[in-house]
Structure formats: structure tokens, C-alpha cells
């Protein structure tokens, strides 16, 4: 009997401001790919819907409130050589609050060319290259 594949569902957000800049955060020390920049997001908990997981993660990480209905599915990328995950990227242009690095992470607003010049996590680099901006 074949084994059931094991992979971790992850959600991330390409949040764009009125100037067309993307919000990215830097992975904190002690985490996988520490120091690399990424789209904010995180793991989907068992039984949790992806949009709800993303709203929760954005609130926990950045203190922002996002309406799940304002999230648009954009791209999917799958496992890299070092991780068996499937990452679902959503886009949004509306939120409430001011970003704060609630987990000690650095964050910033970047144009797509500025973002491409950052040391990005591998899956995030793939997503950025394919994101229609």
C-alpha cells in the first residue's frame, strides 16, 4: 500500500500599498532560512481554511486586520529540495492597522525591483518572479 504523501500547507500574502509596493518581512533568528526576506504568512493549522489561516497569521505577525473576502488567490508553489510544503499566495490591497513586527522580525515596503534585490527565501523568490505586478 502506498504511503500517504506528507506535506505542510502554508499561506502567504502579497500585500500591496497604494504606491504598488509589497510588504515583506525578514525571517527571525532561529527559524528556517533565518535572515532571508519573505511574504508574511505561515502554516495552516489542522482543520483551518487557508484564508482564515492567513488572516490569523497576518494578525499574529504584523498586527494587521484583513477581511478574508479581500484576499485573492494568486499563485501556488510547491516543495523545494529542503522542505515538503505547498505555499498558497494570496494578494490584497486593503487592511486595517499599521504593520508592526510582533515576532521581532524586520519588515518593510519594497518595489518589485527592490524586493528582487533582497536575499529572499527560495519559494518567495519563485513567487515574486511569477507575481503579476
Residue ranges and their predicted role:
Residues 1-22, 43, 74:
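Conserved N-terminal beta-strand and adjoining loop/helix that marks the start
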Residues 65-75:
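A short coil-to-beta-strand element that immediately follows conserved catalytic motifs
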Residues 4, 31, 41, 45-49, ...:
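Residues at secondary-structure transition points
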Residues 89-91, 99-131:
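NUDIX/MutT-family hydrolases
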Residues 21-61:
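Conserved Nudix-box catalytic region and its N-terminal flanking loop in Nudix hydrolases
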Residues 8, 17, 75-98, 106-108:
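Active-site-adjacent beta-strand/loop module that shapes the phosphate/pyrophosphate-binding cleft
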